[in-house]
Amino acid sequence: MANMAVSRIKREFKEVMRSEEIVQCSIKIELVNDSWTELRGEIAGPPDTPYEGGKFVLEIKVPETYPFNPPKVRFITRIWHPNISSVTGAICLDILKDNWAAAMTLRTVLLSLQALLAAAEPDDPQDAVVAYQFKDKYDLFLLTAKHWTNAYAGGPHTFPDCDSKIQRLRDMGIDEHEARAVLSKENWNLEKATEGLFS
């Protein structure tokens, strides 16, 4: 990795570790390898959102061209959000693409991602199914997002009805994650989910 990128990322890493604002927002960052090309972030779900109480892990890959190009960031923790792929964790956020500026930092990225959890942009989705549910069936979106937060991010909510539907599909030989994903996409309609899986 280029010396400029390494020195810059080291400085920003220290800035994030020392930032009182970052600590108050329950954001963490750690080094994955000694070359400073890969970091792991963790953001807490913001209050008054379906992600509240969850801890979401991020993969951060720093290119050799940093800071002139943005880091590649994706959610490792599965999440139900219009701007984040429920399958790959890919993120649709302008500062990670065309609106990146060399003056931006890891701190900016982490705070922006946490803010994205509180302010979804369903008209610019990464996951069209989630965006549709967000816009047309908001109550189901909230239920599903809370359920995923509980299942994957250690959230505080329990949903016995969702869990029993997942168990019904598991009893038919379907993997838990696939069962949850299909039921979520079918608005928790067990009949439609079963049809989709076995037709």
From Swiss-Prot:
Where does the source fall among the domains of life? Eukaryota
Which principal EC class is assigned to this enzyme? transferase
User: Which SUPFAM superfamilies does its entry note?
Assistant: UBA-like, UBC-like
The UniProt GO MF terms for this protein read:
ATP binding; proteasome binding; ubiquitin conjugating enzyme activity; ubiquitin protein ligase binding; ubiquitin-protein transferase activity
Q: Which InterPro entries match?
A: UBA, UBA-like_sf, UBCD4_UBA, UBQ-conjugat_E2_core, UBQ-conjugating_AS, UBQ-conjugating_enzyme/RWD
| Pathway recorded for this protein | Protein modification; protein ubiquitination
Q: Does the keyword Protein biosynthesis apply?
A: no
Reported tissue expression: During gastrulation, expression is highest in the invaginating posterior midgut primordium (PMG), high expression is also observed in the cephalic furrow and ventral ectodermal neurogenic region. In stage 10-11 embryos, expression is high in the pole cells present in the pocket formed by the PMG. During germ band retraction, expression appears to reinitiate in many tissues, especially the gut and nervous system. After dorsal closure, expression is detectable at low levels throughout the embryo.
Any idea where the UBA domain is?
161-199
Do you know which Pfam families this protein is assigned to? UQ_con
- Protein keywords: ATP-binding, Nucleotide-binding, Transferase, Ubl conjugation pathway
Name a biological process GO annotation.
Answer: positive regulation of peptidoglycan recognition protein signaling pathway
Q: Got a GO cellular component term for this one? A: nucleus
In this protein, which residues make up the domain named UBC core? Answer: 4-154
Give the EC number.
2.3.2.23
Q: Active-site residues? A: 92 (glycyl thioester intermediate)
Q: Tell me, what does this protein do in biology?
A: Catalyzes the covalent attachment of ubiquitin to other proteins.
Q: What family is it from?
A: Belongs to the ubiquitin-conjugating enzyme family.
Whom does it interact with, and what assembly results?
Answer: Interacts with Rpn10.
| The protein, known as | Ubiquitin-conjugating enzyme E2-22 kDa
Gene that this sequence comes from: Ubc4
